[in-house]
């Protein structure tokens, strides 16, 4: 499920009849939905493979050489907090990856923290190709493609909305009440505007971030799409990530200024809004590991999962203990790596 953490902002702005809703204020167009189309890539399934170990006797990686798989920024963050690089930081064993690929199975994702692989097949019988690979301890179906999905098309930014300017008093424009509620004005007055920090934003897309004037000055550290890795543009789908990002990164004086306009931002798509499946937890785990390797200080995630399109995948109550679901374990591990993970609960 995709939850917004914007309720505070929305309620603070609701009293102002000049801004009928947050979408209008940020000049965001509605997404155009067209006819149903076949699921991209055709009918397929994805399975999560659990691996027994990191093959420490043969792996080329070592915790003594973290610079081979972590950025200097990530290593420094650990050192600053007295946190060691451990075996969970080591990449998935290359020999295991090769064996799965050589068996004719397509690998679409991997998690070093959880020591798992995400693979895609088109027929159940293809799993037989993995028989005899003793390093695979368990398999779990995490996705089955629906017959069709709604096609979503990027809308253009409406010029009329971009011409909108705030008559709210002061530098912060329509964000004034939001900043005041968070004591942001005092922080900004003391030069705490996010400079030196890197923040990763996890969402389902960032439509038109590249076109909205208030976001033109964003300090963009990187972009990654774990749902459609070959995608050329995460700015073409889903406006929710744009809204979340704007509350932090927008910087257009007298119109809207976010709480941390001087921070660097890593934009990551790990939510597939077309479907709900356990595979999205694998995407999230990959996103967290990518953010860690880039050296982020904070992860802002607007994602959480409980019920799925296939009810057999739904999490039971006893699984909701913070230790069972793959995404929960991954979120907890962020703290082990020195990252503050903030997730919505809307």
Residues covered by each model-derived region:
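Primarily auto-inhibitory N-terminal propeptides
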Residues: 15-102, 106, 124-150
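Subtilisin-like serine protease catalytic core
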Residues: 42, 175, 185-225, 230-280, ...
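Catalytic-core segments of hydrolase enzymes
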Residues: 296-346
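Short, solvent-exposed loop/turn and secondary-structure capping segments
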Residues: 60-62, 141, 149-154, 209-216, ...
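Sec-exported extracytoplasmic/periplasmic mature domains
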Residues: 101-105, 132-135, 249-253, 289-296, ...
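Autoinhibitory propeptides
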Residues: 94-179, 185-189
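Bacterial Sec-dependent N-terminal signal peptides
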Residues: 1-20
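Active-site-proximal beta-strand/loop segments in catalytic clefts of secreted hydrolases
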Residues: 49-53, 121-122, 142, 201-205, ...
């Amino acid at each position: 499920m995709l939850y917004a953490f914007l309720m505070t902002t929305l309620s603070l702005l609701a009293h102002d009849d000049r801004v009928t809703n947050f979408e209008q204020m940020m000049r965001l167009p509605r997404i155009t939905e067209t006819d149903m189309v076949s699921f991209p890539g055709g009918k397929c399934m994805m399975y999560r493979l659990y691996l027994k170990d990191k093959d420490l006797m043969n792996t080329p990686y070592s915790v003594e050489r973290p610079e081979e798989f972590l950025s200097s920024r990530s290593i420094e963050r650990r050192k600053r907090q007295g946190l060691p690089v451990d075996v969970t930081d080591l990449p998935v064993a290359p020999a295991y990856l090769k064996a799965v690929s050589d068996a004719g199975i397509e690998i679409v994702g991997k998690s070093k923290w959880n020591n798992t692989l995400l693979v895609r097949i088109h027929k159940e019988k293809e799993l037989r190709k993995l028989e005899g690979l003793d390093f695979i301890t368990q398999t779990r179906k995490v996705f089955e493609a629906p017959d069709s999905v709604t096609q979503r098309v990027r809308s253009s930014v409406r010029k009329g909305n971009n011409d909108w300017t705030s008559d709210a008093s002061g530098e912060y424009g329509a964000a004034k009440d939001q900043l005041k509620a968070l004591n942001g004005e005092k922080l900004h007055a003391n030069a705490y505007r996010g400079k030196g920090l890197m923040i990763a934003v996890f969402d389902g897309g960032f439509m038109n971030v590249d076109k909205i004037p208030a976001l033109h000055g964003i300090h963009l550290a990187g972009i990654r799409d774990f749902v459609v890795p070959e995608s050329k543009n995460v700015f073409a789908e889903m406006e929710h990530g744009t809204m979340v990002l704007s509350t932090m990164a927008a910087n257009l004086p007298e119109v809207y200024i976010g709480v941390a306009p001087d921070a660097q931002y890593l934009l990551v798509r790990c939510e597939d809004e077309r479907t709900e499946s356990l595979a999205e937890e694998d995407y999230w785990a990959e996103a967290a590991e990518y953010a860690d390797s880039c050296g982020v200080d904070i992860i802002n995630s607007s994602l959480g999962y409980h019920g799925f399109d296939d009810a057999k995948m739904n999490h039971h109550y006893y699984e909701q203990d913070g230790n069972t679901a793959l995404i929960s374990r991954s979120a907890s591990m962020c703290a082990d790596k020195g990252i503050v993970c903030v997730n919505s609960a809307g």
